[in-house]
Amino acid sequence: MTEELQSLVDSIEAEAQRDRPAADTPEIGIVMGSDSDLDVMAGSEEGRPGAYDALTELGFAEQTSYENPPEARFTFETYVVSAHRTPGLMYTYAETAADRGLDVVIAGAGGKSADLPNMTASIAYPLPVIGVPVQEKSVDSVIGMP
């Protein structure tokens, strides 16, 4: 694991140990396996809304720092975590999600097997994980999620 990746894992684990008020933590986590999934998860230039667009339309704000949360009452965070390329980060993200204040995770499924939403759901249980097909070939796997 690279130093940068280990630093991110350590930061997520440390945040899970802090006892922050609910108003200072995001309610929703958005994860995707690759930055190439960002167009679908955030919203595309062609005007198709993504999870980011939907949440901001509902009044949520993106929270990029626990130390300086946005003024909005409802917030979300966005991470790129791969079940294949960064499994340690994905595991830490899912395992600490509830302790970091998340109420739900929205996970983009980029491949046929929907590994990211399925693995995130199995680790973060009982926290709900909503799988979003990023590609057409992901639809069947996401529909088949428990």
Question: Where are the regions that the model predicts?
Answer:
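Short glycine/serine/threonine-rich phosphate/pyrophosphate-binding segments
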Residues: 37-41, 87-89, 112-119, 138-142
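Glycine-rich phosphate/diphosphate-binding loop of Rossmann-like nucleotide-binding domains
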Residues: 18-85
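Short coil/turn connectors at secondary-structure junctions
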Residues: 24-27, 72-74, 100-103, 124-129
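Haloarchaeal acidic low-complexity proteome signature biased toward cell-envelope/secretome components but also
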Residues: 1-25
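Short, acidic/small-residue loops that bind anionic groups at enzyme active sites
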Residues: 120-146
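N-terminal small/polar loop signature for handling phosphorylated ligands or for N-terminal nucleophile
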Residues: 84-105, 119-120
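Short, ordered loop/turn segments at secondary-structure junctions
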Residues: 35, 81-83, 110-111, 133-137
